[in-house]
């Protein structure tokens, strides 16, 4: 099959939600319905020692939360689906942001009892800024939840996009009878059960079929009235508006009971876009170009703790990848010939021989590749959009056993390079390493990973710093003067970019007034010392 045909088969999307909306459960059920796994792991089923396929890190299994991003590839209806499961905890929004740069669509999961929640709004803002198409799944209809019309109104009000229901619930909670497929004009009858795949589901055709009101009475009377209202007042589905991120198809269901999952999976194949062109600084890169390009959007250390490995996750942007091909790392100009390249089902890997635009491949390496690196067959290209945001929380870190100092530095270097935490090395001699984060849980996860993956028992201590700004200047002498005058507040990150550590907003304002030739940046791009001014 040629490159354009293979690209047309690809669907690459991320699942996003507020914590506990059921994102991990839906991820599992999509894998189950696509035939990628035989049994769906329940995050809550501790006694059965069964964990979600996408929650593979030890701390995730202990707490039942997603703190790393997982990549899973599966085939369904002659399409190759690349599913990226994002961190569910809000403290890891930076990793989620990076994942959203690697996808062509997003599946938004909303808890029908809670509606649109803060983390959902933040993630949707990122999707809207990138015009990412969004499919919405309103989950947990088998529980006591809010009215569906109210939920649609909230989505439109908070997220600024039109909703187009593809299905509609008949009843809710204990009275949940199923969902009516508006486009196919039939009702799928709800049956509880976590291992069903829908082959034996019961359907009733036609909104005017007397069998439905006979069985579901008042619940259907309300639902049919709402469906008629939707058919009259709601906008028709416009795929161009959907692809522009202005309209979202909406599905209702219960992921834990495998209900409504089939419709979502079909919509991803039928409506989500194949990979499109990507804009580099130098030119537009089209997916069906003959030559390979790819971007490192994630680096993960110790996916296999037994081998202490580091895997670079590369989104293929164009062309065809072949195992052993000669590639150039644009940032360094160095050449590499990766042979042990893998595809993923969470932490399980398989060697692959080829990949196409939209696919995510894993390249094991020992620090050669960094976040934001661009791989090509020789061309020098730069992609932006993978930022480090200025941290808002700081802690100093020391090792309890001085003999493990080297292991601490190795561990923090690797965790810093993968973006799990930001690591700052003070310019002043003798200063403890500083960790910067956007949420408290990041510190806990790093301490846990240092202990379990590197054998380092680290001590975290409070820090007086509240933020940081990377500093540059067109005048090297002006920059050096500022750094000398503020030596106690200067530190270097993992790529040796200088940063000004701040104790209060007033301190930053004073510095900006006193040193007009120095630029203070709230973000730094991955893949080198490229800076921006807005976080």
Swiss-Prot record:
It is found in: Cytoplasm. It comes from Bordetella pertussis (strain Tohama I / ATCC BAA-589 / NCTC 13251). This is Peptide chain release factor 3. One of its GO terms (molecular function) is GTPase activity. It comes from the Bacteria. GTP binds at residues 17-24, 85-89, 139-142. PANTHER family: PEPTIDE CHAIN RELEASE FACTOR RF3. NCBIfam families: prfC, PRK00741.1, small_GTP. Keywords: Cytoplasm, GTP-binding, Nucleotide-binding, Protein biosynthesis. Belongs to the TRAFAC class translation factor GTPase superfamily. Classic translation factor GTPase family. PrfC subfamily. Increases the formation of ribosomal termination complexes and stimulates activities of RF-1 and RF-2. It binds guanine nucleotides and has strong preference for UGA stop codons. It may interact directly with the ribosome. The stimulation of RF-1 and RF-2 is significantly reduced by GTP and GDP, but not by GMP. InterPro entries: EF-G-like_DII, EFG_III/V, G_TR_CS, P-loop_NTPase, PrfC, RF3_C, RF3_dom_3_sf, RF3_GTP-bd. PROSITE patterns: G_TR_1, G_TR_2. Residues 8-278 form the tr-type G domain. GO terms for biological process: regulation of translational termination. The lineage of its organism: Bacteria, Pseudomonadati, Pseudomonadota, Betaproteobacteria, Burkholderiales.
């Amino acid at each position: 099959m040629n490159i354009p045909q293979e690209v047309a088969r690809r669907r690459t999307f991320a699942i996003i939600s507020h914590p506990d909306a059921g994102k991990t459960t839906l991820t599992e059920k999509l894998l189950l319905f696509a035939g990628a796994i035989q049994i769906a792991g329940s995050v809550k089923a501790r006694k059965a020692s069964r964990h979600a396929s996408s929650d593979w890190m030890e701390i995730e299994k202990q707490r039942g939360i997603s703190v790393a991003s997982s990549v899973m590839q599966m085939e369904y209806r002659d399409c190759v689906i690349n599913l990226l499961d994002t961190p569910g905890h809000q403290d890891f929004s930076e990793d989620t942001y990076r994942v959203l740069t690697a996808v062509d669509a997003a599946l938004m999961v909303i808890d029908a009892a809670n509606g649109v929640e803060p983390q959902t709004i933040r993630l949707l803002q990122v999707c809207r800024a990138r015009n990412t198409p969004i499919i919405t799944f309103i989950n947990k209809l088998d529980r006591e939840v809010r009215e569906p019309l109210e939920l649609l109104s909230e989505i439109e009000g908070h997220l600024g996009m039109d909703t187009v229901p593809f299905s509609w619930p008949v009843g809710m909670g204990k009275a949940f009878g199923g969902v009516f497929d508006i486009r196919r004009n039939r009702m799928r009858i709800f049956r509880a059960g976590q291992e069903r795949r829908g082959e034996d589901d019961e359907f009733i055709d036609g909104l005017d079929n007397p069998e439905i009101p006979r069985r579901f009475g008042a619940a259907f009377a309300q639902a049919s009235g709402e469906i008629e209202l939707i058919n009259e007042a709601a906008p028709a589905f416009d795929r161009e508006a959907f692809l522009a991120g202005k309209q979202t198809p909406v599905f209702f269901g219960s992921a834990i009971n495998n209900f409504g999952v089939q419709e979502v999976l079909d919509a991803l194949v039928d409506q989500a876009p194949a990979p499109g062109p990507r804009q580099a600084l130098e030119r537009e890169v089209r997916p069906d170009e003959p030559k390979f390009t790819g971007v490192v959007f994630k680096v993960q250390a110790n996916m296999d703790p037994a081998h202490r490995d580091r895997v670079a996750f590369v989104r293929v942007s164009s062309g065809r990848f072949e195992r052993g091909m000669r590639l150039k790392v644009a940032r360094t100009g160095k050449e590499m010939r990766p042979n042990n390249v893998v595809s993923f089902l969470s932490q399980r890997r398989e060697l692959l021989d080829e990949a196409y635009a939209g696919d995510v491949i894993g390249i094991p390496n020992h620090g050669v590749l960094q976040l934001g690196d661009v791989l090509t067959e020789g061309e020098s290209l730069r992609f932006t959009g993978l930022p480090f945001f200025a941290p808002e929380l700081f802690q100093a870190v020391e090792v309890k056993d001085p003999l493990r100092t080297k292991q601490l530095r190795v561990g923090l270097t690797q965790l810093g390079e993968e973006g799990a935490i930001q690591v700052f090395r003070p310019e002043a001699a003798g200063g403890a390493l500083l960790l910067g984060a956007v949420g408290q849980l990041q510190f806990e996860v790093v301490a846990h990973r240092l202990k379990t993956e590197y054998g380092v028992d680290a001590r975290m201590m409070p820090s007086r710093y509240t933020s940081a700004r990377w500093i540059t200047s067109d005048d090297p002498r002006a920059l050096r003067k500022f750094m000398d005058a503020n030596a106690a507040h200067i530190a270097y990150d993992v790529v040796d970019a200088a940063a000004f550590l701040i104790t209060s907003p007033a301190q930053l304002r004073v510095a900006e007034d006193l040193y007009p030739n120095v630029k203070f940046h709230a973000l730094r791009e991955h893949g080198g010392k490229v800076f921006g001014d807005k976080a």
